[in-house]
Amino acid sequence: GTDKRQFRHFQTVKFEDLNNLVLSKERKGVGLLGYAVDKGVELNKGRIGAKEGPNAIKKAFAGLPDLNQCEEIVDYGNVEHSHEHLIETQEEYAILAAKSIKNHSQTFLLGGGHDIAYAQYLATRKVFPNQSIGVINIDAHFDTRDEDESTSGTSFRQILEQDEQADYLVLGISQGGNTQGLFDYAKQKEIQYVFADELLHQVS
């Protein structure tokens, strides 16, 4: 039918290629870009499978009713890991994500491993080169490991080491899930954090 009040999102989403995108004069609508990558999780010795996340999220979203007759939604597909080093994939993703951020009122970046955080930061910094950036991470771990290469556990350290205009807040920290070295680094970098049991106390 043509009654948009009956539509679900799979009937309204458009599909485009960011490589061919011509930027509009004003930011409007919503962009979706998947990060179908779990190489960083593998490098961090975690359980792989996160690369299936973007398609799973999109599939669930597609069946939801378009209750508010949303602004135009454009799905730009997924970026997959095809480079020798993860940082190259993160940089590729950042270039594409920045295009979506410039073109739309809202952009949703769908992971994927937690290394999407650094790619998302790079994209945001491309669009807003001089503004301060606030990062909120809901996680039991700081993900500020000191490694020789980018992994799912290094994103926020990478951000803080290269950007004095970035602030970092972590909600849900596990006292037993982070080493003393990570707590020391949090103090050094003035990372704000709330323990998981404090959050549970607030909602109980």
Residue ranges and their predicted role:
Residues 2-35, 39-204:
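Conserved alpha-helical scaffold segments that buttress catalytic/binding sites
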